[in-house]
């Protein structure tokens, strides 16, 4: 809801649209449908699955989700409630399938944070990390890892700055220091800075693709840490 409000404020003349806020555990009625929100874990804050009870049967829409017992934001996926809904009987499952064909288990974001800290600690110069602007958990992990290594952080990309501003207002950036401005960036030693920017999927309007690094030059030695895998249809 905070991101919706921020986006509307950034669009001159945008109509005021009423927004009803609900959270995990809530149930509400829309016409013939009863909808229950179930807590799940993902890279964005406050993700939920929706159990939609219809006259014909129960539909479970997972939204984006993963099993992470140690998330950096929010609570773990409510596996107990999902089992209960499964026992109730699900007519249709609409499920996020990203990386479903890959074998193995997705690492916890807490494990990723530890790896990031190790990479940043060993880097001889600047470190640049690309991620989705919506991935508040990863942005927080990178920022805290940078702080632990005595580095300051520069955000690049309008959507990322907007997301982080909202996340800070809502308390998701607790413990994260203020970020550098591009004006101050040039005065910070190369081994004392980390850049977080959009463009991990090759999006044409992202900070990386629009040559944002012309203003923030990465000369050798530096480390590029592009974490997200390519997602079909993302660019």
In which residue ranges do the predicted regions lie?
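Short beta-strand segments
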Residues: 196-198
